[in-house]
Amino acid sequence: MFHFNRCQHLKKITQKCFSSIHVKTDKHAQQFLSRTFALAELRKSWYSTHSLVGDKNIILMGPPGAGKTTVGRIIGQKLGCCVIDVDDDILEKTWNMSVSEKLQDVGNEQFLEEEGKAVLNFSASGSVISLTGSNPMHDASMWHLKKNGVIVYLDVPLLDLIHRLKLMKIDRIVGRNSGTSMKDLLKFRRQYYKKWYDARVFCESGASPEEVADKVLNAIKRYQDVDSETFISTRHVWPKDCEQKVSAKFFSEAVIEGLASDGGLFVPAKEFPKLSCGEWKSLVGATYIERAQILLERCIHPADIPAARLGEMIETAYGENFACSKIAPVRHLSGNQFILELFHGPTGSFKDLSLQLMPHIFAHCIPPSCNYMILVATSGDTGSAVLNGFSRLNKNDKQRIAVVTFFPENGVSDFQKAQIIGSQRENGWAVGVESDFDFCQTAIKRIFNDSDFTGFLTVEYGTILSSANSINWGRLLPQVVYHASAYLDLVSQGFISFGSPVDVCIPTGNFGNILAAVYAKMMGIPIRKFICASNQNRVLTDFIKTGHYDLRERKLAQTFSPSIDILKSSNLERHLHLMANKDGQLMTELFNQLESQHHFQIEKVLVEKLQQDFVADWCSEGECLAAINSTYNTSGYILDPHTAVAKVVADRVQDKTCPVIVSSTAHYSKFAPAIMQALKIKEINETSSSQLYLLGSYNALPPLHEALLERTKQQEKMEYQVCAADMNVLKSHVEKLIQNQFI
């Protein structure tokens, strides 16, 4: 058996020691166990010394032409450790012939077996190992390597690989047969690389080997530093004594808890990760799934969700359940306006882009010994999206995770209500509340902060409460992807070059969607202005113009765009916290004042800072219907009422000096009566499915949403509960549902 030891004393790169992990004993008693066990395994498998590698190996993986050998030598020099090239140092010495001769001698399938056997008979410690391009295709040998090192995937753009292989005059690699192009083979190989890596280095076009080597070392440092990426409450007050430990949460804890114990919302303690211009350019030709994997890996530490597992979740979330293979395509409407279509998911709204992924994240993060009840308040679209998303979990997860969604009984469209009711499954229920969305949302926050009630549920039923509204970081984060992807699509389609600015116009109620666009800008997307579009419930427009958030004498109006019929915009707190340099004391004062006095005023300096990036206006009901009518008549495209609100505002305030991406947040068929009124179609008092067929007969763009049509057929057989607008009544419903599901 081959065995390599460290050639010399390793250079110490870090001296970070671990402190013990303490498990809280309050109402969130067991929420940390899942990550604690993961960290224990990570530390046990990696930290044999305080140096960067210790006795473990750095294993470089990637396709032929990725630069594994060259980069490995540079890293070996930097760390002063042994460098092993599997081709030269293992295979050829074992076989006494060149790799190409062996491949020609035994053929593709037998070559993989022979290669795997050679690797299984090899061991090393404290070394840099450069794999062959085909090593990851042999499971047993990869498990053998993985248990004694960290695998770093050198992810090189496909066109760069093909160019390099031509220069290297390599035209035969394992698996390539006559009639198989190099491009197709390299694409096929990706599935194996994605299966094994612990950390990915995204190699932008033109990056030098030295730059890639530095990225590898940084990726390993991040992989080791399991305590570096934490979350704090927006109401967290930084201690004056810098030596005092900051109360922070890991990503998995933030997802599980949903709302901070002090009533604030979780946000990253540090800055958002930023991609370089070259990295963004390398994503221009990528698919939505590939973009999501790169971006979310940067935002979620592998100790919370291993990169390969996260990739599996993303592929599951954005698969055949979306009617469009592009997931969130961008369509040119007219002039400088583009429509970002966010309604191709199973429930026809932008909420699907988060809620097809978030349940898988949640199920991964929670410990296996606890039950969880997800409480959701919906203004229309969230309810059905949450119920649909959590219904797609596997059988075991559905037995320990249940959902109840509260919606305003008379505050959503008839179709939305039908859709929410029709989305009920064995682990999800809908409850109508005789009030508005703001009551539903506030009630859920109060339930979370009722420690007596939540503690009782934990002790009596072994059940912990959590949320899937956009107050939950795991729900908000995936929305960043589609804003970034929309910009990349404009570059890909040739409308702009990378670096050119764009504006985004977003129909806004709870501030989550537009906040995700802010985070996309922080990651490097050049968004110039965020245009906040309100309907008659224009509290956000007034706030952006004046800095005064005033709910006094303001009553919620029911409009054609019910999903933004919101007065208390929860995610605004996150943005104000960001603008105020993470001043938790200020957030506590402002939002306590909002709760007690129903208004607050921010200082002039914050108003000016807000207005540097934000523009806002509102749209009347008549203007909304007129926009739907005129857009259809000029382009054959039907806007839903929320998108129409955004278009009216974009037409009014955008200066047309750069493209504006209008977020289309729902499919028009969810609001058939309003659409028929706008198009001056004589409204018929028939079923929702009949209305959809009627609209479908117009052959407009976008086409009829088949999943919505199927859902309307199901709901007519479903029942649901209605309750009074009373906190105690809602709590009683929650307890009864827990009894039915988990006892």
From Swiss-Prot:
One Pfam family from the record: Thr_synth_N
CC annotations in GO: cytoplasm
UniProt entry keywords in alphabetical sequence: Acetylation, Pyridoxal phosphate
Cofactor (UniProt): pyridoxal 5'-phosphate
Gene3D superfamilies in the cross-refs: 3.40.50.1100, P-loop containing nucleotide triphosphate hydrolases, Threonine synthase, N-terminal domain
UniProt keyword annotation of Acetylation present: yes
Record PTM N6-(pyridoxal phosphate)lysine, positions in chain: K351
Keyword Acetylation applies: yes
InterPro entries named among the record's database cross-references: P-loop_NTPase (IPR027417), Shikimate/glucono_kinase (IPR031322), Shikimate_kinase/TSH1 (IPR000623), Thr_synth_N (IPR029144), Thr_synth_N_sf (IPR037158), Thr_synthase-like (IPR004450), TrpB-like_PALP_sf (IPR036052)
Residues annotated with N6-acetyllysine modification: K281
NCBIfam families associated with the record: thrC
HAMAP family: Shikimate_kinase
Protein family membership: Belongs to the threonine synthase family.
PANTHER family, A to Z: THREONINE SYNTHASE-LIKE 1
Name recorded for this polypeptide: Threonine synthase-like 1
UniProt organism field: Macaca fascicularis (Crab-eating macaque)
Classification of source organism: Eukaryota, Metazoa, Chordata, Craniata, Vertebrata
